[in-house]
Amino acid sequence: MTARAIRRCHEKDALMLKPLKPFLPWMLLLAMGLGWGLAFSLAKMAILAGGMPFGMAFWQMVAACVMCFVICQIQRKPIPMTRQAIANYLLVSVLASSVPSSCLMFAAGRVPAGVIAITIAIVPMLTYALATSMGREHQSLIRLSGLFCGIIAILLLVVPSTSLPDRSAVPWILVAAIAPTFHAFNNINLTRPVMAGMHPLHIIFGANLFGAMTLLPLSLASGHMFPLAFPFGVLEWALFGNAVINILAFVGFITTIQLAGPIFASQTGYIVTISGVIWGMVLF
């Protein structure tokens, strides 16, 4: 196929998708929410199947890294390794990969999947708070009211003695809440000019690469490392499923930020909360 024919195909595809463009951010928001909501239940399955937190996070990142590398090679998209690109990978790795994944894995074995999903509602609240404090969004009384209502809702989840079946889970809810806090900072980070020109698959590859490099010694030192079984069992399929979800959802998330901004994209946290609770009820 000639270059002109390929260009015509792209133009034809663009024309076919044009009527859907106004709805695309909403469609992505729903898809991300359903996918990330399932991720908590998959993490719970992996823990129940014998996985250990640091080891689970490590293998999940390795799987995501390998898949992104293969896709980039097939699409002939060379992965940049400049000083600025590496700095971007490291920052996203800390904010969206190694720290959040480890926190969620630790909490998954001690807190119901639905409860962990509820903590994700923190993401849009904190994203809005950060954006307004940095002057990127105008203050709104309605949005501020929503922010305070969200904070009260989280407090109602952990403070009353009857809110949880086991009060020993309270500290682990706070550990789980570290993940959405870091994700909120990453939402703002992804809007920086130095991030704008990077392909989502490159960002995912780099973040998971450096995340896996960080978690490898931690997994070995803590005794959390474990070999993968072949053929795959529940543990391996759960980790592989989470890796696929994270790749697809992160690509959709960056696309949504580019189309509608970080505040809109962060609203997927509410869908994650609802779908996470439903997935937890269905699967457990």
PLM features: what roles do these ranges have?
Residues 10-58, 106, 165-192, 213, ...:
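Glycine-/small-residue-enriched transmembrane alpha-helix faces in small-molecule transporters
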Residues 17-20, 27, 61, 142, ...:
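C-terminal-most transmembrane helix of multi-pass membrane proteins
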Residues 29, 84-92, 139-151, 172, ...:
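Cytoplasmic-side transmembrane-helix entry/capping segments in multi-pass membrane proteins
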Residues 35-40, 69-120, 156, 242-260:
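Specific transmembrane alpha-helical segments of multi-pass solute transporters/efflux pumps
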Residues 41-50, 109, 158-169, 220-237:
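Membrane-interface helix termini and inter-helical loops of multi-pass transporters
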Residues 48-99, 126-127, 182-186, 204-224, ...:
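Transmembrane alpha-helices of multi-pass small-molecule transport proteins
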Residues 56-59, 97, 101, 114-122, ...:
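Helix-helix packing/entry segments at the starts of transmembrane helices
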Residues 68, 139-161, 215, 270, ...:
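Hydrophobic transmembrane alpha-helices of multi-pass small-molecule transport proteins
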